[in-house]
Regions:
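Active-site rim/loop-helix segments in enzyme catalytic domains that contact anionic ligands
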Residues: 1-112, 236
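Metal-dependent de-N-acetylase/amidase catalytic core
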Residues: 1-15, 98-241
Length: 241
């Protein structure tokens, strides 16, 4: 039974872990805008360096990575993020390795989020003409494994303790999903939609179609229609013990 996400006044911080610059803007930027509006501090963690997603023969890996990093910083300003962390793993080569899990766990311990939002760790075959990106799956799997048990358990990676990063228990995990698979729906206000669209437009190297606003509203509108909302984003939500 689909349910609405209700704000929890005890929550103060949230973290979004994604593979690439623009992934969060496509998947959960309305919810990020809403969280910030509700007084939640939000941090992004970008797993890859964003160095591969271009057909422009003038681009190099180094130049593209620098552009995409700046675009993500600008999108973060639109949404009101506290900070954006860049882990710098090679784009299009991301795997759910122990190194990636540890790097994400370090950021969880550093920022101590109550909510962690991540990508679907399974291949999505819901969208016509799209078979899913392996980096997205890797980022989702590593994020979930970092939440439990790596960030939680004090004796996992003692060197993180030496760095000053003690264990932390995330209280909720929101996995980004399409409207057909989500079981929790976050209702978005017009203010949230405007910021989500503006944030996505910050990614000029990747978002090169003119109807960004219309598409975003159509996507969020279709999601919201499942539960009687004008706009919404869908998640699988886990409350952790």
């Amino acid at each position: 039974m689909p349910r609405a996400i209700e704000p929890n006044p005890a929550y103060k911080r949230a973290m979004v872990v994604v593979a690439h610059a623009d992934d969060a803007e496509y998947g959960c930027s309305g919810s990020v805008a809403k969280l910030v509006r509700e007084g939640i501090e939000v941090v992004y963690v970008l797993c890859t360096d964003g160095s591969k997603g271009s057909d422009d023969p003038q681009d190099t890996q180094e130049s593209l990575s620098a552009v995409r990093k700046q675009e993500q910083i600008e999108a973060g300003k639109v949404l009101g993020l506290t900070t954006v962390e860049f882990l710098g793993f090679p784009d299009s080569e991301l795997e759910p390795t122990l190194a990636l899990r540890k790097a994400i766990a370090r950021e969880i311990r550093r920022h101590k989020p109550d909510i962690l939002i991540c990508q679907n760790p399974t291949r999505s075959l819901e969208i016509a003409g799209y078979v899913g990106h392996p980096d997205h799956q890797a980022a989702g799997e590593a994020a979930l494994s970092a939440v439990y048990p790596t960030a939680r358990d004090r004796l996992t990676y003692p060197d993180l303790l030496e760095e000053g990063f003690g264990p932390h228990k995330v209280r909720e995990v929101w996995v980004m999903l399409g409207p057909e698979r989500g079981d929790f729906f976050n209702e978005l206000e017009e203010e949230d939609m405007k910021k989500a669209v503006a944030a996505l437009k910050s990614h000029e190297s990747q978002v090169q179609y003119p109807e960004v606003d219309a598409r975003m509203r159509e996507w969020r509108g279709r999601t919201g229609a499942r539960v009687g909302f004008k706009f919404a984003e869908a998640f699988k939500v886990f409350t952790l013990g």
